[in-house]
């Protein structure tokens, strides 16, 4: 019987390092189209490869299931609760920045986000999901990270913090160590991203949001 081989977890597998990006994207200056408000999509379209890999498959994935998959691929379910929450918030805010700015659609692609760690987060088709992560996502899935007077969710980047160092980004192992010391979720996030980082909440909509003509944003 054929058995699917699940790729390695990012904390011990060999994956490309994240290519640094600005955490706040310029909008409206060179024709980019963005959503009118921050929303939580019902679905995202995941391109299972690098953006330019035309052979990679696109998957329609429920937003919550996507976040659960990424979190289970990026961190360990045995970590302290505040570290799990901090990492999930960073994953969600990064993802919602891609949604809000229509980052890939503005580049001519028909997907929301990729599974390449060089560009986005690790998403593994068909992987197992851990309860401790699943429960947190179900509780806080409408949240994202914001800064004062910035409309878009912050593109909160991170790295493992052991094999790779990333100043001004969150260290995944470092977040676990801070949680072990009793840091709260927001204290962990502010330790890495600065004191003007806040947790915000958006409304959930049905379907896949788009600013292009022919689509309506409906509240789910």
Locate predicted features.
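Conserved, single-site charged/polar hotspot
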Residues: 3-220
């Amino acid at each position: 019987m054929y058995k699917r081989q699940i790729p390695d977890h990012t904390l011990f597998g060999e994956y490309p390092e994240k290519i640094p990006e600005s955490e706040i994207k310029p909008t409206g200056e060179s024709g980019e189209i963005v959503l009118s408000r921050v929303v939580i999509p019902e679905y995202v379209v995941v391109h299972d490869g690098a953006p330019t890999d035309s052979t990679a498959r696109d998957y329609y994935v429920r937003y919550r299931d996507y976040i659960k998959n990424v979190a289970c691929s990026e961190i360990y379910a045995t970590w302290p609760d505040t570290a799990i929450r901090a990492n999930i918030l960073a994953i969600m805010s990064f993802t919602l920045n891609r949604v809000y700015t229509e980052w890939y659609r503005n580049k001519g692609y028909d997907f929301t986000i990729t599974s390449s760690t060089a560009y986005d987060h690790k998403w593994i088709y068909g992987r197992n999901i851990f309860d401790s992560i699943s429960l947190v996502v179900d509780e806080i899935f409408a949240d994202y990270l914001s800064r004062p007077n910035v409309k878009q969710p912050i593109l909160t980047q991170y790295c493992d913090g052991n094999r790779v160092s990333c100043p001004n980004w969150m260290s995944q192992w470092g977040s676990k160590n801070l949680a072990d010391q009793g840091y709260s979720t927001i204290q962990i996030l502010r330790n890495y991203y600065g004191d003007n980082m806040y947790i915000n909440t958006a409304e959930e909509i049905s379907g896949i949001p788009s600013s292009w003509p022919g689509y309506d944003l409906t509240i789910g």
